[in-house]
Swiss-Prot record:
Gene name tied to this protein: ruvB
Chain segments carrying region Head domain (RuvB-H): 276-356
Region (Small ATPAse domain (RuvB-S)): 202-273
Organism phylogeny: Bacteria, Bacillati, Cyanobacteriota, Cyanophyceae, Synechococcales
Organism this protein belongs to: Prochlorococcus marinus (strain SARG / CCMP1375 / SS120)
Keyword Aminoacyl-tRNA synthetase appears in the UniProt entry: no
Function, in words: The RuvA-RuvB-RuvC complex processes Holliday junction (HJ) DNA during genetic recombination and DNA repair, while the RuvA-RuvB complex plays an important role in the rescue of blocked DNA replication forks via replication fork reversal (RFR). RuvA specifically binds to HJ cruciform DNA, conferring on it an open structure. The RuvB hexamer acts as an ATP-dependent pump, pulling dsDNA into and through the RuvAB complex. RuvB forms 2 homohexamers on either side of HJ DNA bound by 1 or 2 RuvA tetramers; 4 subunits per hexamer contact DNA at a time.
First-level EC class: hydrolase
Name of the protein described by the UniProt record: Holliday junction branch migration complex subunit RuvB
Annotated GO MF terms: ATP binding; ATP hydrolysis activity; four-way junction DNA binding; four-way junction helicase activity
Membership in a protein family: Belongs to the RuvB family.
Domain of life of the source: Bacteria
Assembly: Homohexamer. Forms an RuvA(8)-RuvB(12)-Holliday junction (HJ) complex. HJ DNA is sandwiched between 2 RuvA tetramers; dsDNA enters through RuvA and exits via RuvB. An RuvB hexamer assembles on each DNA strand where it exits the tetramer. Each RuvB hexamer is contacted by two RuvA subunits (via domain III) on 2 adjacent RuvB subunits; this complex drives branch migration. In the full resolvosome a probable DNA-RuvA(4)-RuvB(12)-RuvC(2) complex forms which resolves the HJ.
Protein EC: 3.6.4.-
UniProt subcellular location: Cytoplasm
């Protein structure tokens, strides 16, 4: 196996923390703030680009629920972060003409947290729970009768004076979102009438998403420029919008807001060390360590973690999934192995200003 020299330093200060990566699909603090110009979320089926099979399934269920004038079945959406699970829940609410209340499982620590939410629901409303795999056991048990029989059972009093009080709830729809469906307990998972996966987006769909966001930003983007961002965003709309913001910053400083072309996009993303395959410095550091130090592998995850100064779980959940997805990495019984495709890509990039 040919070797690509990286100038790798064992004690490099580079860090793979999710909080600092431009290509991290989890929402950043910037994206958590609602600002007028950054309200990029679609509000209806027509505005939601991609996921055509999912939209067809949910669209039929929505029309059926509306025709019967009843609540939609409980919905479980799963898939990698950044693909639009929260957005889909909001679109469902708009299409049904009801309010969508949003919370996350970690926020429902105490029984009164989930009870308060359930008691305040109006008929046919949506309750969206993000990271539902992180629900506590107590919260889950409170949800079981609420999901199945639309009631909650409260225990009043203590000891011999304790008694159970049954409170009826209006019919509602729980929309759960998770990146780890296997971590959801079977009793909870079985109570969802509709379970659907969100898949990574195609380049053409991402280009349409980017062009729509550029219009909302008041940015004039050529077709080639949109495609260039789409190729580097890992099939994830959240990353696409984040890269577009960085391109907009660069165009603002360069006074080229009137027309953003492919050349400007390339300069901007090269500045952020995002290459044409969507790899960033952390990805390349991971790959180049295996190549330079272990001749392409195999190498164990714990060895990689120790050498890179990261936790094994961080590498496994943050860096490896995309490299596996694009065929740059293989997991074997003996450890991680670099593929020929990864080697060819790194060889082609070795003279690029991205590789420093």
């Amino acid at each position: 196996m040919a070797i690509v020299s990286s100038g790798f330093e064992k004690h490099s200060s580079s860090n793979l923390s999710r909080k600092t990566r431009l290509l991290d699909p989890t929402p950043s603090l910037e994206e958590g703030k609602v600002r007028k110009e950054d309200s990029l979320r679609p509000k209806c089926w027509d505005e939601f680009i991609g996921q055509s099979a999912l939209k067809e399934v949910l669209g039929i269920s929505v029309k059926a629920a509306l025709s019967r004038k009843e609540a939609l079945d409980h919905v479980l959406l799963y898939g990698p972060p950044g693909l639009g699970k929260t957005t889909m829940a909001l679109v469902l609410g708009n299409e049904l003409g009801v309010k969508c209340r949003i919370t996350s499982a970690p926020a429902l620590e105490r029984p009164r947290d989930i009870i308060g939410l359930l008691l305040n629901l109006e008929p046919n409303e949506l309750l969206f729970v993000d990271e539902i795999h992180r629900l506590s056991k107590v919260a889950e048990e409170l949800l079981y009768p609420a999901l199945e029989d639309f009631r909650i059972d409260l225990t009043v009093g203590k000891g011999t004076t304790a008694r159970t009080r049954e409170i009826n709830l209006p019919r509602f729809t729980l929309v759960g979102a998770t990146t780890k469906p296997a971590s959801i307990s079977s009793p909870l998972r079985d109570r969802f009438g509709i379970t659907q996966r969100l898949n990574f987006y195609s380049i053409s769909d991402l280009n349409r998403i980017i062009q729509r966001a550029a219009d909302l930003f008041g940015l004039s983007l050529t077709g080639d420029a949109g495609l260039e961002i789409a190729r580097r965003c890992r099939g994830t709309p959240r990353i696409a919008n984040r890269l577009l913001r960085r391109v907009r910053d660069y165009a603002t400083v360069q006074n080229q807001l009137k027309l953003v072309d492919k050349s400007l996009v390339d300069k901007s993303l090269t500045l952020h060390q995002v290459d044409e395959c969507g790899l960033d410095q952390s990805d390349r550091r991971f790959l180049l360590f295996i190549i330079d130090v272990h001749n392409g592998g195999p190498v164990g995850l714990d060895t990689l973690a120790a050498a890179l100064g990261e936790e094994a779980a961080t590498l496994e959940s943050v860096v490896e999934p995309f490299l596996l997805q694009i065929g740059f990495l293989k997991r074997t019984s003996r450890g991680r192995v670099i593929t020929q495709a990864a080697l060819e890509h790194l060889n082609s990039c070795k003279n690029s200003p991205i590789i420093k």
